Design a protein with these regions (language model features):
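Alpha-helical coupling/stalk and coiled-coil linker elements that connect catalytic or binding modules
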Residues: 27-28
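IMPase-like, lithium-sensitive Mg2+-dependent phosphomonoesterase catalytic core
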Residues: 1-22, 31-32, 37, 43-254
Length: 254
């Protein structure tokens, strides 16, 4: 059943990619559930995912970063809940940078321990998708079909450093850590989009992505269900590690 959900996400990604190629949308006079200003294409991408996922008999509900409430399907006894960010990094569209979609497939409950599969889509020069279950598999859309490029694996030591958040608000200990990475020869690679930045680290073999709690956002800004848990799951399947600085991400409560 999870394969059916993933196939549906692939088809939705194709539709969203086509929208992005002809996008002329602007900002709406509204914000999403996280308080971010919405673009018209954010809302349209959300509609595409919602409509296609709620038609599946195996999906009980969907939980979108763009909406306040969980949306339930008519399949009340179905096992899976899909949480997703339909268009992560959409503020980069006007710069013509890569953006993405993020998803997590949960069994029964919205908690990290119930995550059965996760992944993301990259809308860039090529359309790509990474899906993690037992391993994290890398796909690219070529000649009108999805090609499996193989499993992604992180090296023992990377060279990319992607630190997010406003530097002047970083805590001293985080600033010291980032400076120590640069002193070790790590290279700065940060676009402001979670999907392209984390994807680059995987493709290039390793590194560190961080978006810490700051003085102006003491709880951090990343959302667990739609962003943090799915990417933590992917990275662990690639041989990496995800932490909040105290404990493993996939042991955290929602």
């Amino acid at each position: 059943m999870i394969s059916v959900i993933i196939d549906t996400l692939r088809e939705s990604a194709l539709r969203i990619d086509a929208l992005l190629k002809h996008n002329t949308s602007g900002y709406l006079q509204s914000t999403n559930a996280s308080g971010d200003m919405q673009l018209e294409i954010d809302v349209e991408a959300d509609r595409i995912f919602q409509a296609s996922l709620l038609e599946l008999p195996c999906v009980k509900a969907i939980c979108s970063e763009e909406q306040e409430d969980i949306c339930y399907s008519q399949s009340t006894d179905a096992p899976y809940i899909v949480a997703y960010d339909p268009l992560d990094g959409s503020s980069l569209i006007d710069s013509n940078l890569s953006i993405g979609s993020i998803f997590g497939i949960y069994n029964g409950e919205l908690k990290a321990q119930s995550l059965m599969a996760s992944g993301y889509v990259v809308y860039g020069p090529c359309l790509e998708m990474v899906v993690a279950q037992e391993r994290a598999l890398h796909y690219r859309y070529i000649d009108e079909q999805w090609r499996n490029l193989g499993a992604l694996e992180l090296q023992a030591k990377g060279r990319i450093n992607a630190p997010g958040g406003t530097q002047k608000h970083w805590e001293a200990k985080h600033k010291m850590m980032i400076e120590s990475l640069f002193a070790q020869g790590y290279r700065l690679r940060y676009s402001g989009g979670m999907v392209p930045d984390l994807h680059q680290i995987l493709i290039k073999g390793g590194g560190l992505f961080s978006y810490p709690a700051t003085n102006d956002a003491p709880q951090g800004k990343l959302r667990k269900l739609f962003e943090v848990f799915p990417f933590a799951f992917v990275y662990e399947k690639c041989g990496g590690y995800a932490t909040n600085g105290v404990q493993r991400i996939l042991e955290l409560e929602v």
